[in-house]
């Protein structure tokens, strides 16, 4: 009988914390397009393990008539879809066309009202006070859309998947006006829907959060990862039908 002991030790760690799943292998050396100019969304996309992601601003005017939609999140979903289509159509004619296009649109809602980006410091302060004084959480919705081109000539020539993620956020009601004024002056939230950046100093405004933190930043990474998997799987299946 051999005296050699079976090696039951766990596998060693990969260097540089590289995440490699079947989808990472599938998209290695592929052209991945994020239809956004947001550095925050690009950072979140890279966090999913795709450092090779390219960004491309859609140019879609994002001026859909909100009154035409029954719910605000339908407006976000339609905007996300149009962003993805605009970028796909812009790049599809290139010699190195994209292998996958991902877009997103985030809105913040309080009591059925869409909270846009602040117009000026006065509007900004009023917006933050409204969020602080609310007895109920506000909701952050991000619609994510994924396009995967198809090789077979079937209209419209691509697979489209869309997902809507909801996160509830509650401001700390004890925050003082002086603190809100200081936050407005720092300028961090001046270009953010709702007037705050939860990934920065804006985290000091938050009492509680229910749902995906990354959704509030602008891209729900777990939901986006799963949506990409689904779109790629359907694209592969349709190509071989």
Curated annotation (Swiss-Prot):
Main localisation: cytoplasm
GO cellular component: cytosol; nucleus
Residues at the site labelled Important for substrate specificity: 40, 106, 199
Cofactor: a divalent metal cation
GO biological process: cellular detoxification; nucleobase-containing small molecule metabolic process; nucleotide metabolic process
Gene3D superfamilies, per database record: 3.90.950.10
Short name of one Pfam family: Maf
GO MF assignments: dTTP diphosphatase activity; nucleoside triphosphate diphosphatase activity; UTP diphosphatase activity
Compartment annotation: Cytoplasm; Nucleus
Domain of life according to the entry: Eukaryota
Name of the protein described by the UniProt record: dTTP/UTP pyrophosphatase
């Amino acid at each position: 009988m051999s005296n050699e002991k079976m090696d039951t030790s766990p596998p060693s760690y990969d260097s540089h914390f590289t995440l490699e799943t079947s989808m990472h292998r599938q998209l290695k050396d592929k052209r991945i397009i994020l239809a956004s100019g947001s550095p925050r969304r690009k950072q979140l996309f890279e966090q999913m393990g795709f450092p090779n992601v390219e960004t491309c601003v859609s140019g879609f005017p994002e001026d859909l008539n909100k009154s035409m939609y029954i719910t605000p999140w339908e407006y976000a979903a339609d905007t996300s879809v149009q962003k993805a289509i605009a970028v796909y159509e812009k790049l599809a004619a290139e010699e190195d066309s994209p292998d996958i296009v991902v877009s997103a649109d985030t809105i913040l809602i309080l009591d059925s009202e869409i909270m846009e980006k602040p117009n000026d410091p006065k509007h900004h302060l009023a917006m933050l006070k409204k969020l602080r004084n609310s007895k109920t959480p506000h909701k952050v919705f991000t619609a994510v859309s994924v396009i995967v081109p198809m090789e077979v000539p079937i209209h419209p020539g691509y697979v489209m998947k869309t997902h809507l993620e909801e996160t509830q956020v509650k401001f700390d009601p004890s925050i003082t006006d002086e603190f809100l004024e200081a936050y407005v002056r720092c300028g961090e939230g001046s270009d953010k829907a709702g007037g705050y950046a939860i990934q920065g100093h804006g985290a000091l405004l938050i009492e509680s959060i229910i749902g995906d933190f990354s959704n509030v930043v602008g891209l729900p990474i777990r939901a986006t990862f799963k949506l990409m998997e689904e779109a790629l799987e359907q694209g592969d299946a349709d190509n071989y039908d």
